[in-house]
Amino acid sequence: MGIPSKPTLDSCRRCALGAKATQGVPGEGPAPARLMLVGEQPGDEEDLAGKPFVGPAGRLLRRALAEAGIDSGAVYITNAVKHFSFELRGKRRMHKTPAQKEIEACGVWLDAEIDGIAPTVIVAMGASALVGVMGQRLKVGEARSMELIHPSGAQVRATYHPSAVLRAIDEPRKAELYAALVSDLRAAFEAAGKAELPAMTLALHAARLTPTP
């Protein structure tokens, strides 16, 4: 199938979100990439811009990446759900956690991205991202210490979504979550550099690079 294009996501109606959102928001970054970050869904600013992580959570994520010593341009960044899930409150579009069926509907696009990006490590940021990547709902705090493997062979690391840092109840908790995010990103980056590409991934990319007779 290949990495889904923006026109493909714009026209997607696998769930009801595609008809409500402004546009689909594809992932962004190099292909292949050893490290892939998966968030929950586009926010209001991402929905309008058509790009992932351009709002407050995105700015915090890029600061965390820099602090972890990671070049954001070398990382593929995407979301488990490709359209903005929201509810209207007056004139404001407020974030609404995507339903299980919406995450599952977008699974075909996330699987295609993982196939095309061929990461050695996938970082699932938040519970919804874990559902998208692993197909099961896990508590982030517990999953951070788990050794998870995606069916592609890629390692899966769990961490907090940047928006969870921004929503922290007080400054000490915000500092705690931010430090955990930076630490998890650094550990994932180091693991991605050490890990061997999964045999299945190598075979797939070799097949793509082989000229057709």
What are these language model-derived features?
Residues 1-213:
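A polyanion-binding, active-site-adjacent surface
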